[in-house]
Amino acid sequence: MCLGLPMTIVETDGVSALCAFRGEQRRVSMLLLSNPPVGTHVLVYIDTAIRLLDEEEARLIGAAIDGLGAALDGEDCDRFFADLIDREPQLPAHLRSE
C-alpha cells in the first residue's frame, strides 16, 4: 500500500522544498505546484508534492495514518476516524450520478 504524507514546507527554492512530518524531513519535488510558501501543508507521494492541503485536511490525513498504525497493532482505531463515524459514506462529486 502506498500512502501520501501530509508534510509542511520548511524551506523552498521553487523547484524543490524541504518538508517535515513528525520529525522526519525530506527534500521533495515541487514541480507540480506553483511555488507555495514556507509553512504550507502539501500532500507528498513518492517524494513529490502532489497537492496543497489546508490545515484541517493535513490533520485528518495524519489522524488516518495514526489509525492505520493502531489497526495494524490490533488496537481500537475509531478515535482516529471521528469525522467518519455516524455518517454515510459519500462518493466524490465526479462519481455521483446526476
UniProtKB/Swiss-Prot annotation:
Matches recorded under Gene3D superfamilies: 2.30.30.140
Pfam families: HupF_HypC
GO MF annotations, alphabetized: carbon dioxide binding; iron ion binding
GO biological process, one term: protein maturation
InterPro entries the UniProt entry points to: Hydrogenase_HupF/HypC (IPR001109)
NCBIfam families: hypC_hupF
Similarity section: Belongs to the HupF/HypC family.
Record-given protein name: Hydrogenase expression/formation protein HupF
UniProt source species: Bradyrhizobium diazoefficiens (strain JCM 10833 / BCRC 13528 / IAM 13628 / NBRC 14792 / USDA 110)
Phylogenetic placement of the source organism: Bacteria, Pseudomonadati, Pseudomonadota, Alphaproteobacteria, Hyphomicrobiales
Gene symbol of the encoding locus: hupF
